[in-house]
């Protein structure tokens, strides 16, 4: 299997495989955050029912559980396909790091998924069959299981962005885990988990508030709608504030371990001390800018020193730009970051040493391999420009995420004010705006993932394995065919989900 890492794969195969994985991931992420968010709302509603034993809260809980169930099933279906793609389209990746990457996914499948499967059955079919306390526990444990599932998947993703706790074994040609705790509890994983889960709560909260506002527009289910707005807006406001805090921590981590991603997010071509944070700028949306010759984007409006503060926690800290990273630069602590050409040379040394050791078992190659293994992936890079991700996509996706996220803070705060201090049903403009917030919240969430994944290109595993070496040696035509099959399948699934959700929302809660 390892020999495939040394073959040339056509660019068409790489592009179609990337497109297929992106398609599956984007569709999967339409379902997952709503599942995580609705789980919190269900838990709060049923806790109210458990405490006061009022049938009203039971109806509220069961109504949101019904919508949760539809979405949960779709999320499971798309998630299974996503995991299979690692073996079909990315077999070299699976072979190279399967011992490390597979561990969190195995735990997710054995622990979290079975936990969800067990308690979701009790949650749906255990009403009036088990005690109220056990049913409440089942509802919360269903949400906890989904959250634990997200934890292990995000641990795996974080490891790809910041690989720690592993060592390369030249005899097996694979990375092997040396510290499970380093992988599971890396700062990158913790930040990614907290930011992703809080953003999921935001989507669930937005959905609940929007559906409730639709009822108020139709002058239906007024009591349920107002109670749900209080829950949803409360959860949403807390979640947006937490997402802002965890987003700041995530950006700091990116600055430390993925400086090229940060440079692309900011369209920062030439770095320096006391760098400003770009609020808006004119970056061509459809072509890579001439970062080698341009000083900065046109029509740039920026906040002085803010980027340095976010990236280094000091107002005059040094932040490298795209050109600095390519040419090499000096860190604040005085250590030197090699140029891309130096890294490529060292990466090629590592590959040659590995091939020689594999063919001859010459032990004198092992010190050379160990010395240069840090830059192993650079040995596959032909041109420094390959290391610069799409600046327009990263730049605008990041601003979409932050802009809509800021709008959501105001939205939830206004929701709470109107539902507690005013007669919210009288503000028709707000009720309509709430419905519009559903696609905006999804755009913000998907934009965050686009920044995270596009921003680390060309790496499958940061610095260790580029996309071009992680791919399976398969025909581009077969991948293209399955791409369109999946596109049709996922679009149909999404249409079915929306249709069922709309039907159930129009039907409303079922009163006993």
Name these PLM-found stretches:
Residues 2-512:
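Polytopic transmembrane helical bundles with strong interfacial aromatic enrichment
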